[in-house]
């Protein structure tokens, strides 16, 4: 193995992956409230745990953070006797142009900048180890006002190609099928939901313009796991003006024996998860009602809960004959359009299951 990129599972300080004593470089992406049960309910506590990956003399990089988070990261860097630098905007190419990114979304520019600085540092330290000063702590100020920015550099052709070819299934991903476009993003925190919603809003709008000869409908498939705040995650989605919203637990099918280890959580309480879906639907209706009062648009309160991802997908795609009022409303929506845009988000498990179905089922 020439290089290993190790991502922590939860936090950093006490995560099981935090066993590498001498990494080449460390990086921390934008912090958000996640895994609150384990990391604490404040951004300061989360930042403390995340900074647990810092190692003495190993350079660390992060993106611009909230002031309280940056203060904790800086203090932890000083404790661990290492430098911490904030990456600037993504370096331009040699001709001054902005590099193309294979993973779409404005928020990915920040991630790309962190990635290229981590890669550049790895190459420098591996190729010129004797020239690199391992401990830069003495030259660093660690208060938020003085946290140094990493130096910009021109991107080589290999960097440009890497950024352009980068692909992450389930992140800002589009899959086109006959009559349908699936937009998938496993965002599951408030900030990431806001970012991917902006991506979907712009991307779906562009598709509508490019296919102006077709009438379209927008459908949301949503779920999240854990103790996250449903209202906080659903609020950013209200502006998308969905024609129909579907909720389902992170179950591939309603048959337990169909679960696979790659995309299943075997510790989940199925009954509780299904109950949460109904709670999420109720919260969505409240969110949408509040949005009506602050927006000139009038969102449509059409939603439904399904027992599994497969049922939700096939109900949308197959559009079987139904008898209930809700189904009639859905049939009225889908029968009057030529193309359906389906946004799947809220959980990496949910997106993973959708990808599996799209790959294996005749959709």
Which residue ranges define each predicted feature?
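Glycine-rich phosphate-binding loop signature in dinucleotide/nucleotide-binding domains
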Residues: 1-2, 203-215, 319-341
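C-terminal helical cap/extension that packs against the catalytic core
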Residues: 66-79, 85, 182, 190, ...
């Amino acid at each position: 193995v020439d290089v290993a990129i190790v991502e922590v599972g939860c936090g950093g300080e006490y995560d099981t992956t935090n066993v590498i004593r001498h990494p080449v470089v460390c990086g921390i992406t934008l912090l958000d409230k996640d895994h609150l049960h384990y990391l604490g309910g404040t951004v300061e506590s989360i930042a403390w745990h995340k900074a647990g990956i810092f190692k003495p003399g190993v350079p660390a990089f992060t993106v611009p953070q909230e002031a309280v988070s940056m203060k904790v990261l800086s203090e932890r860097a000083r404790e661990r006797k290492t430098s911490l630098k904030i990456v600037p905007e993504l370096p331009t190419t040699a001709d001054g142009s902005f590099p193309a990114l294979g993973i779409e979304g404005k928020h990915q520019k920040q991630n790309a900048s962190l990635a290229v600085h981590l890669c550049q540092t790895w190459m420098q330290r591996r190729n010129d180890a004797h020239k690199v000063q391992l401990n830069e702590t003495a030259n660093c100020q660690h208060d938020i006002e003085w946290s140094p920015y990493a130096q910009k550099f021109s991107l080589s052709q290999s960097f440009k190609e890497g950024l352009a070819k980068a692909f992450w299934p389930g992140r800002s991903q589009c899959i086109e099928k006959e009559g349908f476009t699936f937009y998938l993003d496993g965002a599951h925190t408030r900030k990431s939901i806001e970012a991917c919603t902006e991506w979907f809003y712009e991307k779906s709008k562009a598709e509508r313009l490019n296919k102006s000869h077709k009438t379209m409908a927008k459908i949301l498939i949503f779920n999240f796991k854990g103790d996250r705040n449903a209202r906080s995650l659903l609020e950013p989605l209200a502006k998308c003006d969905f024609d129909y919203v579907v909720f389902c637990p992170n179950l591939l099918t309603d048959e337990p024996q169909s679960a696979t280890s790659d995309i299943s959580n075997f510790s989940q309480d199925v009954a509780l998860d299904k109950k949460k879906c109904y709670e999420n639907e109720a919260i969505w209706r409240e969110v949408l009602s509040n949005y009506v009062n602050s927006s000139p648009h009038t969102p449509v309160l059409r939603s439904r809960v399904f027992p599994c991802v497969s049922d939700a997908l096939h109900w949308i795609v197959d559009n079987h004959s139904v008898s209930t009022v809700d189904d009639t409303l859905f049939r009225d929506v889908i029968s009057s359009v030529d193309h359906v845009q389906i946004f799947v988000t809220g959980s990496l498990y949910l997106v993973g299951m959708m990808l599996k179905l799209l790959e294996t089922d005749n959709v």
